[in-house]
Regions:
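General beta-strand structural signal in soluble alpha/beta enzymes
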Residues: 54, 130-134, 180-183
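Active-site-lining helix/loop region of Rossmann-like oxidoreductase modules
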Residues: 153-217
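NAD(P)+-binding Rossmann beta1-loop-alpha1 motif at the extreme N-terminus of oxidoreductases
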Residues: 1-44
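Rossmann-like NAD(P)-binding element
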Residues: 48-92, 98-106
Length: 217
């Protein structure tokens, strides 16, 4: 499958690398590929993953069947605008980002909550896209290697389009997730995003980001 991962931070790089390892054709989108490739952290990673193609947001999205948004939440809509609404039309857009506000330091707050979600804002901004929210409730290591945990835990999926959620669920299964919980329509992403404040607190208390939430039935 042709996939575009928008975002070159730790999570974007982890997801892009793992999906390429699984046999997908992956582009990693950035505002300025030349400047990104000049960064020491990215250059070293890119040398280890030559099968992942750096591209502009627009070029990555244009070539993709599925677009994954793995950016700082405050930049998500802007990044997708640069990718181009015409390049998102009819495509599955998997939103992994979170509406975290670090303007007052740590711990962060949420810049959208309760009656809205970042995923819904993305859907409203790009109504022809098929937005699915998932993977936002865990660290990037656990996103791509859930087997690192003795019990991988649960992963949540929200979206209005059943076929788009099926596509996202297929990718989650490839990544090794087994407890995939469909929360319902895209408004259910509000709850998934609101887990982040407690996730951040847990990380501080436990001194590690290598954990996950688990729904016990």
């Amino acid at each position: 499958m042709e996939l575009a991962v928008l975002g070159t931070g730790a999570a974007g790089r982890a997801i892009a690398a793992r999906l390429a390892e699984l046999g997908h054709h992956v582009s990693i989108g950035t505002r300025d590929p030349e400047a990104t490739q000049a960064r020491d952290d990215f250059a070293g990673w890119a040398a280890d993953h030559p099968d992942v193609r750096p591209a502009t947001f627009a070029a990555a999205a244009a070539a993709a069947e599925v677009v994954l948004v793995v950016t700082n939440g405050s930049a998500s809509v802007d990044v997708l605008t640069q990718a181009g609404a015409d390049h998102l039309e009819g495509k599955v857009v998997i939103d992994v980002s979170n509406p975290l506000d670090f303007s007052q330091g740590m711990p962060p707050t949420l810049f959208v909550k309760d009656t809205d979600s970042l995923a819904e804002q993305i859907q409203r901004a790009f109504p022809a896209a098929r937005v699915v929210k998932t993977l936002n409730t865990m660290n990037n290591e656990v996103m791509v290697h859930p087997e690192l945990l003795p019990d991988p835990g649960s992963v949540f999926v929200s979206g209005d389009d059943a076929a788009a959620k099926e596509t996202a669920t297929g990718l989650l299964t490839e990544l090794g997730h087994t407890d995939i919980i469909d929360l319902g329509d895209l408004s259910s992403a509000r709850g998934a995003e609101m887990l982040l404040p407690i996730w951040v607190r847990l990380m501080g208390v436990m001194g590690t980001a290598r954990f996950n939430f688990k729904i016990v039935r």
